[in-house]
Curated annotation (Swiss-Prot):
Belongs to the universal ribosomal protein uS19 family. The gene is rpsS. This is Small ribosomal subunit protein uS19. Protein S19 forms a complex with S13 that binds strongly to the 16S ribosomal RNA. One of its GO terms (molecular function) is rRNA binding. It comes from the Bacteria. SUPFAM superfamilies: Ribosomal protein S19. InterPro entries: Ribosomal_uS19, Ribosomal_uS19_bac-type, Ribosomal_uS19_CS, Ribosomal_uS19_SF. The keyword rRNA-binding applies.
Length: 94
């Protein structure tokens, strides 16, 4: 179920304050955040936001196509190492 349109998109307050301050100062620093739940706002376009994935911060350069998505969608939390390789003992007939 999607969020109600009358509420508007959720953006953590501390993150929006940093983005607005950088926009007014015309500054483009990397903003580190743990807020994966925040929605990408049009004011964030052009900024690089380092989103925490549980282990490290993944730099995400925000483009217009990302508006409306969550920041966590662009910082994967799981790494797939591949399925186990076939061994001689596993392929032997029983």
């Amino acid at each position: 179920m999607a969020r109600s349109t009358k509420k508007g998109p959720f953006i953590d307050g501390h993150l929006m304050v940093k983005i607005e301050a950088m926009n007014q100062a015309n500054d483009r620093k990397v903003v580190r955040t743990w807020s994966r739940r925040s929605t990408v706002h049009p004011d964030m376009v052009g900024h690089t936001i380092a989103v925490h994935n549980g282990k490290k911060f993944v730099p995400v350069y925000v483009t217009e196509n990302m508006v409306g998505h969550k920041l966590g969608e662009f910082a994967p939390t799981r790494t797939f190492k591949g399925h186990a390789a076939k061994t001689e003992s596993s392929s032997r007939a029983r």
